[in-house]
Structure formats: C-alpha cells, structure tokens
A protein has these predicted regions:
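Active-site loop/oxyanion-hole signature of alpha/beta-hydrolase fold enzymes
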Residues: 68, 75-115
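Conserved HGGG/HGGXW glycine-rich cap/lid loop of the alpha/beta-hydrolase fold
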Residues: 33-83
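Structural signature of beta-strand start/N-cap positions in the alpha/beta core
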Residues: 45, 72, 110-113, 134-137
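Alpha/beta-hydrolase fold catalytic core
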Residues: 1-46, 68-71
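Alpha/beta-hydrolase
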Residues: 167-179
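Flexible "cap/lid" loop of the alpha/beta hydrolase fold
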Residues: 122-130, 135-167
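Catalytic nucleophile serine of serine hydrolases
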Residues: 84, 118, 142
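Conserved catalytic-core motifs of eukaryotic protein kinase domains, centered on the activation segment
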Residues: 58-60, 84-90, 149-152
Length: 179
C-alpha cells in the first residue's frame, strides 16, 4: 500500500534514514531565497543534489559512505524544497545552479564533484555547462535532458537543458543504451 503525506520532509525524518549529525549547516541567501545546506566529513567535496519534490535528506544513505571513503559530502535543499525557501520567481535549473554556486562560495569550495538525480541531475549539468571550472565531474541519473518522449511544456525544457546536456555529455552519450 502506498501512503501519501502532506509533509514529506517531516515523515521522511521520522520514518526514513536520517542524515548524520553535523555542526556545519546553515542557510545561504541567493536571489531572493534562503538555501539550506549541510556538510559532513572532510576531503574532496562532493555536492549531492536531490530530485524534484525531494530534499537533502534523500541522500542519507550515501552521506556516511562518502564520509567513510574520505570525502566531504554536502547536501543542499533546492529552493522551495525541504528547509529552503523560495521567492515568486518561476523555478528554473539555471536559477538552481546559481543557488549551488552560492553555497559553494559560502563554503569556500573552488571545485567539487557533483552527483544529482532527476531535477538535481539537470541542475548539475547546467552548472557544469555554465561554469565548468567549478565542477570536477558530474554523476547524473534519472535525468530528463532529452525531451523527445515528453509533451512540450515550453522553451525552458527544449532550450536550456538539452543544450546543457549536449555540451557536457554530447548527444551520442544520451542515446547509448545500457546493456
């Protein structure tokens, strides 16, 4: 049976895996929103970007593994998700990429590896496309960067994300089948 909850963050914190304790967390103001982040461990930074309607706690199983492997794991709640606020601007991956850069700047991170799923994957590709000098590498999955099988909802999907995916991964990479 599938259950639905009005406040998924509260439910997940009570019923799902929880992030480890950390004193390194807070908010960064960027373009009208307060963006929440938490950092764990030390070493080379790895940014973890969640999917739409998710939050940083969705990475609770991965954070300890990254820390034990010698990485500094940073989770970020996208604007309007989890603990982060939003303003009246429409959501866009470009805007969310600037939120990630603002967190990187606040934490004095020059360059980081980025892992993202779904909307977090789209944001990571936009980030790598716009400011490749700040991105050591991108691991992305469940990313809808090729809209050919979806109903067109505007130039946002067709323009920005496809261009970003092609510039980072190349069009042939997006068409490869997993065997």
């Amino acid at each position: 049976m599938i259950e639905s909850h009005d406040d998924e963050l509260t439910w997940f914190e009570a019923e799902g895996a929880s992030l480890p304790e950390t004193e390194e967390q807070g908010f960064v103001e960027n373009d009208g929103a307060q963006i929440w982040y938490a950092a764990f461990g030390s070493g080379s930074p790895v940014l973890l970007l969640h999917g739409g309607l998710g939050h940083g706690g969705n990475w609770a199983y991965q954070v300890p593994v990254l820390v034990e492997s010698g990485y500094r794991a940073i989770v970020i709640d996208s604007r309007g998700h989890g603990r982060s606020t939003r303003d009246t601007q429409p959501y866009s991956y470009d805007l969310m990429a600037t939120d990630v850069l603002a967190v990187m700047d606040a934490l004095n991170i020059e360059k980081a590896a980025v892992a993202g799923w779904s909307d977090g994957a789209c944001t990571s590709l936009i980030l790598a496309s716009k400011d490749s000098s700040r991105v050591a590498g991108v691991f992305f999955y469940a990313c809808n960067m090729d809209p050919s099988g979806t109903k067109e909802t505007g130039t946002f999907i067709r323009g920005n994300t496809t261009t970003a995916a092609n510039s980072v991964a190349g069009p042939s990479c997006l068409r490869q089948k997993i065997r």
